[in-house]
Amino acid sequence: SPLEQELVSQADALLGGDDAFLIVDDTAFPKKGTHSVGVAPQYASALGKNANCQTLVSLTLARDEVPAMLGLRLFLPESWTSDPTRLARSGVPEPRSTYRTKPEIAIEEIDRLRAAGLRFGCVLADAGY
């Protein structure tokens, strides 16, 4: 989107370069219900256990002490992607309705950021990636 492109351009101008790091992580949001898109029992690192939650894959550009979040994508567990009725009822767009692992989502986002001209020296991620 134009907004994402502008965000990447500004972040690159301020932080981009060989000494910048692209940090890949995921964030879990605990949920009590079952209707929020992507909610399912899954590992929530903030809680240190499996819990009913939504999980997002994030990509942040950082140099020195300055971070800029450039990507945040919802992870859909197989319990969601294998249920076309649930996906349609929730309004999940067709391109996002197929199952992708968190590392696959991260690679798609890295490719998107590189194609947009973002410069970074290396990617940092935990063992889950």
Locations of regions flagged by a protein language model:
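Conserved, well-structured functional cores that handle cations and Mg-NTP chemistry
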Residues: 1-124, 128
